[in-house]
Amino acid sequence: MIENNIISDHFTVEELKKLKITPPDAKMYKKIRSNWDLVAKPLDGMGDFEFLTAKIGAVLGDENIDISKKAVIMMCADNGVVAEGISQSGQDVTLAVAKSMARKASSVGRMAMTAGADTIPVDIGINSDESVKGLLQRKVRMGTRNFAKEPAMTKAETLEAISAGIDIVRVCKADGCRIIATGEMGIGNTTTSAAMAAAMLRCDVATVTGRGAGINDSGLERKIRVIESAIEKYDLYNKDTFEILMTVGGLDIAGLVGVCIGGALYHIPVVLDGVISMVSALAAGRLLSGVTDFIIPSHEGREPAVALLCEALSVRPVIRASLALGEGTGAVMMFALLDMALSVYKGRTTFDDISVSQYERYV
């Protein structure tokens, strides 16, 4: 299990960008796709799950794909921009939900138990000094600064959060974990993720900004104005990814950037949750080439940025249920679907087993 005394390696931005990633095994990917063709079913009959499981096997370097040991890492942090009235909830909700996560009583905790996954809730920046049993302590600071007034984080704080995410994945790998899901909790993080999406994609703020946990029309207008003002204030359309993350991102997002990078470094597939995880993955991939080869999409969330982020990440989520819960719930739901798909793959009922001629691939 992960303990609170993890010691992280700290990187400079330049060192971070120079980390070496060994790509997934392309031959293994082809082998697994060929194995799927031997299963008694129409060619490509399992749809996206055939290439997604092949991708997982290529990351793990094993055609006998084993994802029995799973974990969901939930980065919990507060965001100073909440002071601008962009959420109907206060920062006290972040701590309350994090406590529920620590007891495995939150939505993702219930779902993880069903999926057979460990839960790793992380205090990477909750605005409280309360010690919570079951909450991994990796606090960088007590919430970010209000980016409407000043940059959310310093360079050192951003790097510390990224480093924490990488190191947690390292420990998961050492503990035998075979696949990881991303999750988060932080009031105001649909604002930080929308700001990052708009800046990284260089698109209109309104096209990527949604209602989050359910703000009204005036709240949405205020949220858009706050983000627009920040992009103009810091000239973010002309800044690089790290500066965007540091300026309008959150500690939860920076931690998940580290999780995505850690998945690539330690060859553990990373199943993304919704918009906040997608923003984190896009930032990670832009900071370090090759990271996105290790990510697996799960669901199309309700936030409007999702479609553009999926396009930028070249991913196609398989779950379309208008989810907007966060915490990693969609990613954990994907665990169950992957297990079912792999039961077909590993069961290997062949055409000979059912006395049927094998399909031939013509295209």
Residue ranges with predicted function:
Residues 2-363:
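N-terminal loops that bind phosphate or other acidic moieties
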